[in-house]
Amino acid sequence: MLTEHRPDGLLAAISLDFPDGHHLGRHFHPQAQFLYAARGLMRLATHHGAWVIPPTRAVWIPPRVEHEIFMSGEVHMRTLFIEQPETPTPLSDCCVLAVTPLLREMILRAIHLESQPRLDDFRQRLQGLILSEIANLERMPLYLPMPRDRRLQAICQALLKQPELGLTLDDWGLRVGASSRTLARLFAQELQMSFHEWRQQLRLTEALPRLLAGDSVQVVARDLGYGSTRAFSSMFRRLLGETPRDYLGRLEQLARIRGRED
């Protein structure tokens, strides 16, 4: 367990730093968990799929969801453990979220409160504000669901090993013994996305840690099967709202402004 949960049932916050390559094995918490990547990149895996959490983003984990976490680069993790609110939350499953500056400051405030005398009334109000802000955050397309159907499993496992493969559904159909129409239907039914969307999200989740590690946009685009840097940048912008260069430039600017994360 990462921390002892508060016996009074209020929000608990913790600040943890991890080296590159660190792995937190499978575990779960009775509370909902909000993991904020102040620095570095995290990969979250459950039985249902995988999520990538780049710097300045966060992931929501509902109570009692078994998961493991892999660190890429030096990771500064800021964690909130939150009792399920009495009112239903729209976040019923794991999801990656874009963190606002307001929420970031509230997270840091919650961590600071852990070392202060008991301020339960204030802590309770802060928890309500944090939950309200989390519920309205933008979801990021950084989730890679995994299928149950053996034919889809064969396709997805092959692409996980070689994300640059450009085979069509017709090509895959010949390999796994199903028509492209059947495979398209299965992707929509099991994964709630098309084959093309799944492959795009796979490539995005593969691209982010490499870009953050310093690989050039050109090399990453080539290695992931894109015919041009422009095509890769177009996909990146469509999914994340900015080009790879703008994304990396923004992170560098934030790092300069903040100096180091608290």
Language-model-detected regions and their locations in the chain:
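Amphipathic alpha-helical segments enriched in hydrophobic/aromatic residues interleaved with Lys/Arg
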Residues: 87-157
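N-terminal regulatory/effector-sensing and dimerization cores
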Residues: 1-96
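Pre-recognition alpha-helix immediately N-terminal to the DNA-recognition helix
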Residues: 150-158, 199-206
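Short coil/turn motifs that cap or connect alpha-helices
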Residues: 179, 194, 227, 242-245
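Basic, amphipathic alpha-helical hairpins
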Residues: 110-118, 133-141, 155-168, 187, ...
